[in-house]
């Protein structure tokens, strides 16, 4: 039987599992990569494993996408993963190319015990500010989850008035597999929304810039003015300057 190379191994892992994998049927480079990946992902389970050892089962990661853009909503996700989950190449969404994020999002949705998405639009961001909008989106995502969450691992910030115990982790999307999964779902959902907005307002090229303040986007903003989904509190300074 011909041994699986690295590309074939990754495809197998996306659609199968470690349990049904014959390690002797891997090329040396594929086996070396897999050993490194297993070690990396086990390190990303550090916080989850500590909580499992305390007898908890439903641990959720929470993260957001869209605090920085000039346009559109802030999107949060909340994800509970199984204890023995192995998703190759899962990481902070910002470290992954778009195509990889899309593929990983499909796997996460399929393998997750439960997940939720929360969205707060640009109008509300202008009304309550981006931090409060982010917290509101996170709460929405948490309450969308079907299982009873026992503990929250949150990227960087603490969520006030939350009846569930939580731990904010700085750069949590790189340190916790649950937060990484949430970061990917939030980013993929927000990118999908921005592609839809691009169809309505193609002059700003939202499909490419996703609403961030690129040079091209700012030039279009100055040329055409803001559209209905621009965050007024963000673009006023740019237009005045």
UniProtKB/Swiss-Prot annotation:
Disulfide bonds: none annotated. It holds the Pfam family RNase_HII. PANTHER family: RIBONUCLEASE H2 SUBUNIT A, RIBONUCLEASE HII. GO terms for biological process: DNA replication, removal of RNA primer; mismatch repair. The keyword Hydrolase applies. One of its GO terms (molecular function) is RNA binding. It catalyses: Endonucleolytic cleavage to 5'-phosphomonoester. PROSITE patterns: RNASE_H_2 (PS51975). This is Ribonuclease HII. Its cofactor is Mn(2+); Mg(2+). The lineage of its organism: Bacteria, Bacillati, Bacillota, Clostridia, Thermoanaerobacterales. One of its GO terms (cellular component) is cytoplasm. Belongs to the RNase HII family. A divalent metal cation binds at residues 63-64, 155. InterPro entries: RNase_HII, RNase_HII/HIII, RNase_HII/HIII_dom, RNaseH-like_sf, RNaseH_sf. Endonuclease that specifically degrades the RNA of RNA-DNA hybrids. Its main location: cytoplasm.
